[in-house]
């Protein structure tokens, strides 16, 4: 809800547990128009919290005085509509508030930084040197079954509306090479690739495999990153920023 100057009322999801009674986004006054998914800092009681401008119309009554948004993280692009829809689904499924779940999935250090401090972190990331040029990898020849799987996956990627596919194969049957070829097709189409690993112990091995394959294609310092519980808070923020900004 905005006026002609762009100011108005925004809904903001904040980290408030379900049992607190604050089960949904709260209304705040904003001096500028803010897109859904924008990260902000807002007051709640005596605290100041990280919040996310949430999709949907505000509910404030005209005679109610609203507290203002304190700061806007305008150095970051808003979180996407699909991300917000996923959080809405998860909040409903797990019976938690959207702000509580958002706080759990965003990097912990993000909750502690001001927009100015975050901007300084981003400038530091931009100064990271690029990796040395790597030779193009030698790809193994595909077995007929692998080639058929790669063809079907890449056709869906090219079509623009991929559907879930189940790749079946026993251990050692060559599934990882199919994943690598599918990732290569997605990267060639200008997209990002998210790989879910079943257990943390497999992360270094799989990350090394992807780095070896794509080092020549992705020479950036943070082109391939991982997110898991063994990372330090600073590493987690750095890697999340790389993914969110599209450099990873």
Model-derived regions, located:
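Accessory, non-ATPase domains that flank or precede helicase/AAA+ motor cores in DNA-metabolism machines
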Residues: 1-248
């Amino acid at each position: 809800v905005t006026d002609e100057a762009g100011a108005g009322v925004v809904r903001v999801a904040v980290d408030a547990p379900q049992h607190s009674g604050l089960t949904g986004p709260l209304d705040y006054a904003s001096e500028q128009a803010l897109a859904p998914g924008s990260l902000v800092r807002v007051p709640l009681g005596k605290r100041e919290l990280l919040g996310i401008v949430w999709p949907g119309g505000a509910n404030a009554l005209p005679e109610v005085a609203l507290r203002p948004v304190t700061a806007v993280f305008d150095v970051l692009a808003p979180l996407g509509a699909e991300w917000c829809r996923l959080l809405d689904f998860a909040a409903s499924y797990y019976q938690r508030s959207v702000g509580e779940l958002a706080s759990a999935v965003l990097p912990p250090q993000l909750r502690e930084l001001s927009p100015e401090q975050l901007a300084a972190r981003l400038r530091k990331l931009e100064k990271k040197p690029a990796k040395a040029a790597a030779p193009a990898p030698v790809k193994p020849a595909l077995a007929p079954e692998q080639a058929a799987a790669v063809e079907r996956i890449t056709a869906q990627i090219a079509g623009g509306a991929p559907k879930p596919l189940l790749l079946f194969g026993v251990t050692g049957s060559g599934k990882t090479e199919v994943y690598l070829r599918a990732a290569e097709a997605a990267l060639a189409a200008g997209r990002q690739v998210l790989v879910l690993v079943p257990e943390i112990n497999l992360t270094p091995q799989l990350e090394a495999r992807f780095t070896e394959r794509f080092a020549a294609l992705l020479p950036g310092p943070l082109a391939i990153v991982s997110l898991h519980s063994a990372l330090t808070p600073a590493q987690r923020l750095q890697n999340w920023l790389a993914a969110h900004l599209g450099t990873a």
